[in-house]
């Protein structure tokens, strides 16, 4: 299978890319480090279109949602295509519990992504959409916090096992990780 992943050079994207590559899948890695900015949607789309699965992981402003629309539009009606969208468990918490305006902005951007996925699902057409909401995941090697974090490689391996549940099962939404208080 050919899999495109935004934000593949660090954190969750890197862990998923590593595992899928080890399983023999062809990875199309898209990140700023290799010249693919998530805001350059036409450029990204040319790399994503020939793939079977797209992991919509990188997030800058509302570009993640805009890219979802572009890929969905391009893949509409094409059987076998799947888009995995990475959000956050933070969206399950009240906005008043967030530590500041920067986190509130991130929260609103992820809420927009999640609502877009829910609305696109009503079209009941290909591509299939999956929403993944990580809890606390240690995405940096030296990450420390008073809160517990899941190991990113273990988290990614667990997610892939769930996503590979079989052809007769469709996974629409996953909340996976250490939940935020």
Label the model's feature ranges.
Residues 122-150:
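Flexible, glycine-rich beta-alpha linker
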């Amino acid at each position: 299978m050919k899999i495109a992943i935004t934000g593949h050079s660090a954190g969750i994207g890197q862990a998923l890319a590593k595992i899928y590559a080890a399983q023999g899948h062809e990875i199309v890695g898209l990140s700023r480090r290799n010249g693919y900015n998530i805001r350059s949607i036409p450029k990204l789309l040319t790399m994503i279109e020939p793939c079977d699965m797209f992991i919509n992981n990188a997030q800058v402003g509302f570009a993640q949602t805009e890219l979802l629309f572009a890929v969905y539009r391009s893949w509409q009606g094409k059987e076998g295509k799947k888009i995995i969208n990475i959000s956050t468990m933070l969206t399950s918490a009240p906005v008043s519990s967030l530590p500041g305006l920067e986190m509130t902005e991130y929260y609103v951007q992820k809420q927009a992504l999640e609502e877009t996925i829910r609305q696109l699902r009503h079209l009941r057409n290909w591509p299939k959409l999956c929403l993944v909401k990580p809890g606390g995941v240690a995405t940096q090697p030296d990450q420390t916090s008073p809160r517990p974090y899941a190991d990113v490689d273990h988290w990614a391996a667990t997610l892939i096992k769930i996503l590979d549940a079989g052809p007769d099962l469709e996974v629409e939404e996953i909340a996976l990780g250490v939940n935020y208080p």
